[in-house]
């Protein structure tokens, strides 16, 4: 049974840059509360209802899952509390697992693996193609990581000034902040961070990145878009791939190519235009993998990035960005809505 409610965006803390909107939640055993604001956003409404359907089917509607929000989430607040206290509660672990399974169910229901993969190949993995399916860009990008025949993907969702709210790391990419909470010294050259806080950016944007992490060096390409969530907050979605496995599959020495590109970047202050050989290889991979935005990345300078700016690997060091606000309070909104309904 669906029950509709009205709840406007809420500024949880005075210093918070983002507002929070409670979109929907499941109340055991079989009631789904949905914000009237979703009536104006069919793509997000379809996703929310699919998630709650998954919870009912997979977990018998036991209610052990987080509310769906825009701008913040209760489990994110628990993550921040965990970082501070080190306490892990079994109920939180179970709730997080239920969240994941219900969300994955929704993705599989709305984007069945084989037909969706054929759709991606036909449309060259263009994120704008989500409009054809009346789906959100976020759902399409997340689902790419599950259906692609190429396994080396990563995906991030983030809010200003740099809070990760969703992470997939099939290619093992180190997190730009070390964990799911904000730290004081993030690398400002990650696209997922840089594009959030610049006043004007080309949207969407692809970027080739050389990631230096201790004695390991990686080569990634990410495609990043800035969108507005249902609460009106600026949100960033970033989908990326590890290029070295794809390069090696073509019989090309990936390490030699990486060293050449890194040298060009170091000599140019940390970023540089791709040389003709690297451009040729990237464009070839774009054609083989049927990923149009990979080919578009050759027109943007490659950047050296690091997990933390205090351990910057550029010859010319970067300047970190600082922020410390937190987002909490979803559970209290949920209780208020339930009390009104009763």
Task: Describe these PLM feature segments.
Residues 1-342:
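Active-site hotspot residues in diverse enzymes, especially metal/ion-binding acidic/histidine motifs
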């Amino acid at each position: 049974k669906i029950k509709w409610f009205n709840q406007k965006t809420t500024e949880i803390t005075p210093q918070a840059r983002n507002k929070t909107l409670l979109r929907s939640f499941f109340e055991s055993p079989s009631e789904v509360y949905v914000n009237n604001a979703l009536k104006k956003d069919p793509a997000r409404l379809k996703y929310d209802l699919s998630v709650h359907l998954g919870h009912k089917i997979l977990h018998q509607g036991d209610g052990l899952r987080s509310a769906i929000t825009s701008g913040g989430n209760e489990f994110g607040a628990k993550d921040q509390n965990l970082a501070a206290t080190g306490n892990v509660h079994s109920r939180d672990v179970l709730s997080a697992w239920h969240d994941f399974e219900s969300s994955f169910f929704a993705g599989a229901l709305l984007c069945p693996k084989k037909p969706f993969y054929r759709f991606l190949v036909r449309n060259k993995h263009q994120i704008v193609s989500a409009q054809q399916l009346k789906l959100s860009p976020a759902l399409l990008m997340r689902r790419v990581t599950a259906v692609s025949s190429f396994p080396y993907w990563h995906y991030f969702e983030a809010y200003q000034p740099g809070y990760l709210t969703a992470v997939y790391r099939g290619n093992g990419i180190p997190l730009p902040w070390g964990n799911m909470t904000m730290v004081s010294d993030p690398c400002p050259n990650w696209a997922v961070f840089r594009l959030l806080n610049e006043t004007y950016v080309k949207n969407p944007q692809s970027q080739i990145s050389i990631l230096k992490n201790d004695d390991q060096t990686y080569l990634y390409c990410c495609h990043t878009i800035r969108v507005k969530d249902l609460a009106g907050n600026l949100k960033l979605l970033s989908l990326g791939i590890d290029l070295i496995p794809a390069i090696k599959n073509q019989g090309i020495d990936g390490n030699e190519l990486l060293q050449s590109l890194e040298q060009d970047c170091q000599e140019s202050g940390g970023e540089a235009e791709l040389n003709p050989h690297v451009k040729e290889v990237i464009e070839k991979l774009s054609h083989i993998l049927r990923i149009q935005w990979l080919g578009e990345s050759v027109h943007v300078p490659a950047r050296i990035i690091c997990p933390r700016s205090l351990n910057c690997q550029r010859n010319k060091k970067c300047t970190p960005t600082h922020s410390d606000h937190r987002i909490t309070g979803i559970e209290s909104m949920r209780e208020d809505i339930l009390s009104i309904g009763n």
